[in-house]
A protein has these predicted regions:
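Helicase motor core with emphasis on the C-terminal RecA-like subdomain
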Residues: 1-136, 140-143, 167-171
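Cys/His-rich short segments
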Residues: 144, 149, 153-171
Length: 171
């Protein structure tokens, strides 16, 4: 996955991108790997002090950074119109979340590319996160994950599938 991400970013040199990861640990690891490969990237998550987060966001907005590697909660706070791509390192928790997160790309009306990496291990990890929660919450969480998995596995036009999911018509 790391090699594919590095290759993708290098094919889009100088373009702004956001990479979402499920854990702070993965955010830190991936940002370090990208930096080691001469990619202007930085981590962005709740475990960083507010000064570091603020500097990272400013650097991204001022194009001193090309890539922000973020946890979902913090990546959603980034409002940069010319983000060209969004990459999910891990499968999103729901289609609603995926739709919002990918909405960071192409806000200026130009092309935005969205890439999702996932494996069955991701699904198992997310299911483990649900253990200990009320049964009803677990059931809803599993349903959302199944929908996301079906989306990722589908060979149908994904835009069409997303619009259908939200009750909209494909133009």
């Amino acid at each position: 996955t790391n090699k594919q991400i590095i290759k993708f970013i290098k094919q889009h040199t100088g373009k702004s991108g956001i990479i979402y990861c499920l854990s702070r640990k993965k955010v830190e690891e991936l940002a370090a790997i990208l930096q080691a490969n001469d990619i202007k990237a930085a981590p962005y998550h709740a475990g960083l002090d507010s000064e570091t987060r603020s500097k990272t966001q400013d650097d991204f907005l001022m194009e001193e950074l090309d890539i922000i590697v973020a946890t979902i909660a913090f990546g959603m706070g980034i409002d940069k119109p010319d983000v060209r791509f969004v990459i999910h390192y891990d499968i999103p928790k729901s289609l609603e979340g995926y739709y919002q997160e990918t909405g960071r790309a192409g806000r200026d009306g130009e092309e935005g590319i969205c890439v999702v990496f996932y494996s069955k291990k991701d699904l198992n990890k997310l299911e483990k996160f649900m253990e200990g929660k009320p049964v009803a919450e677990q059931d809803i969480g599993r349903q959302l994950l199944q929908e996301t998995e079906a989306y990722a596995e589908s060979s149908v036009c994904r835009r069409k599938m997303l619009l259908h999911y939200f009750g909209e018509d494909y133009p």
